[in-house]
Amino acid sequence: MDLPPALLSFYCPIASEVSPEHEAVAQEMYAWIHAMSLTSDNRQAKMLAQAGAGFNSYFTPRARGELARALSKYNVCAWIANGMVQEIRDPGTFGAMAARWARIMEEPATCPADGIPMDFALADAFSHIRRTLSPVKWQHFSAAQSHWMHGLAWENCLHQVKGLTVHDYLSFRYVMSGCFAAAAFAYAVPERHPSAEEWAHPKVRAAADAAMMVDALDNDRYSYLKESLTEADKKTIFAALRHENPALGREEVIVRGVQLRDRILTLYLTLRGELLCDASEGLRSYLTGLDLIIAGNLVFCADMGLRYGLPEGSVRTDAEPLDRTVAPPGIGAIDHWWAQAGA
């Protein structure tokens, strides 16, 4: 399939970093995956180990030592859970599992004695994370990840829905893709974090939400080819745009999706610049963490390109956005972010 040039050309003026511990952590994750009986397939175990360590190495490259290993365990579990959304078609069955996992994330001791391997793996991962974080960081992180489980349950229910508007898609994507959950990594990893007042400031929240929505829309771009070839019933920004505008051709749908993503990234860069003018050390660390997640997502998905069926070298960065518009896009689900620019 010929891919429109805009699909895999990513505007991103943010530098990425890579953890020097990647290979060591990946080897440990491979052994842990087998110890937790998450798979008996060595090839699958190797892929999961690289994915789990890769999330840490590219998204949170400054997490080292025990924290890197604890987060990588969770990343493995998150990868598996995300895949199960498509495999289990009964919302009741998946919802029951997601609810159990959400509670294990909040309190690992609730893991049932007769649970499945995924239950035990999550309990081990979150017990490990709890030991490495301060109580404040732990509560923040575990609550955010539990929140993501609700999004996965929603996504599983959407198998029964034919189409979503762009507004509804972005509202659901915020939770399903883990925007709130992903930003929690930027809070957990640095030694210093923003105060409660700084973190809750509307401009900080708008910046974090916009940053993580960029990641979510980038993931739609990475998975486009694989889902087109398999005819997967996956809700994406492109499917939502086509649902609202059935007459649009494939390339125009992709261009509009990329333009929306670039407008959101442009807004994030504006909000970040305003916040950095008088930011505390903790807030600066948080914003740097958001930067690393955005840039790291590009490196990670290029590295994991085979999973998405992408041709080698097809992921590119671009110095210019497809859309420089500074006004809100007229989508109720996200327009309020723009109100914080200049506020």
UniProtKB/Swiss-Prot annotation:
Its EC number is 4.2.3.150, 4.2.3.149, 4.2.3.151. Keywords: Lyase, Magnesium, Metal-binding. This is Diterpene cyclase DtcycB. Mg(2+) binds at residues 219, 223, 227. Belongs to the terpene synthase family. Coiled coil: none annotated. SUPFAM superfamilies: Terpenoid synthases. Signal peptide: none annotated. It comes from Streptomyces sp. Its cofactor is Mg(2+). It holds the Pfam family Terpene_syn_C_2.
